[in-house]
Amino acid sequence: AGWGEAWRPWGARRSQVVSGRGGARTFVTATEGNHGRGVAWAARLLGHKSVFYMPKGSSMERLENIRAQGAYAEITDQNYDGAVRLADQMAKQNGWILVQDTAWPGYEEIPAWIMQGYTTIAQEIFGQLKENNLQMPTHLFLQAGVGSFAGAMLGSFAARLGKDCPVTCIVEPDKADCLYRSARSGTITPVTGDMDSMMAGLCC
């Protein structure tokens, strides 16, 4: 099946989740800023409510950007993983919809939708390269974050270019190097403690 056929059931399910049928819904997520601002904007646009839990060290500017969309947002005393657990707990307690780009067993559908959204960035890159008669890049440098952006981008390039996929480097703060540690150990390895980095939005 082509992209259109594969996309159809996902699109129908997404429509059910975000539709206004049954009244306003409440979406909740953990965020360090960018993801949350987008969710807050979409919730406001569609007439829904949104709640955000931000990890300690998040900037006041990002907090206020989210609140400016009419959302409830607070900076917690948790690191990013702790904020995710809090958002998940509050979703279960209150019947809210968790919109998280971090996946775990039993919570994979919505993160997959978010990754599908990220693939539009790759499609824009392909389109602009073709429009300007430019060659495909030889190297990709991608932020790690929680892995969804990097996975979506690398997957898009690998699916399109196959063996000609660019050499790819995934970059993360040295205080939040869980992907690096996991790759070295061969098993999922969390990072605990304070994640002090000038790239606070990537300390997840």
Q: Which stretches of residues belong to each language-model region?
A:
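Active-site-proximal loop->helix
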Residues: 10-29, 37-90, 179-190
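Glycine-rich oxoanion-binding loops at beta->alpha junctions
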Residues: 1-27, 109-130
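Hydrophobic/aromatic beta-strand patches that form the interior of the parallel beta-sheet core
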Residues: 51, 74, 97-99, 141, ...
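Short, acidic/small-residue loops that bind anionic groups at enzyme active sites
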Residues: 48-62, 139, 160-175
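Active-site/ligand-binding-proximal alpha/beta "capping" segment
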Residues: 97-161
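Active-site nucleophile and cofactor-binding loops and adjacent substrate-binding regions
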Residues: 27-33, 142-146, 172
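Active-site/ligand-binding loops adjacent to catalytic centers
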Residues: 81-88, 95-107, 159-204
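Buried hydrophobic positions in well-ordered alpha/beta secondary-structure cores of metabolic enzymes
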Residues: 33-35, 43, 66, 125, ...
